[in-house]
């Protein structure tokens, strides 16, 4: 099963990517999380950062998978009707083609909102080639 958590790439450079994911009631994973108060599961927020990091890393001969997560912090619920703005920076290259990233996802309840949006999730994580 694959969930595409990138609706748009709004900025990209060799070391940074910014993406948007608009969360709707149609998202299958919101059906049971939580009944009567649907919110984007925390693991899906992490997956949004991982998908952005894969896109930033570019095509590889061996697919990149999540190898490590460090200092992951959650700060806000992401409800249907909101947009998650994901920013991922390439932090450093590790041994064996692994790459460490810093990620942060902000909650945008309205793309025209003024002020600083709330941080929904932030942390460091590493992607490494899949071991077959």
Regions found by a protein language model. Give the residues of each.
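Hydrophobic residues in beta-strands and at strand termini
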Residues: 23, 74, 127-129
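Generic helix-packing signal
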Residues: 23, 56-57, 107-109
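Catalytic strand-loop segment that frames the active site of acyl-thioester-processing enzymes
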Residues: 1-40
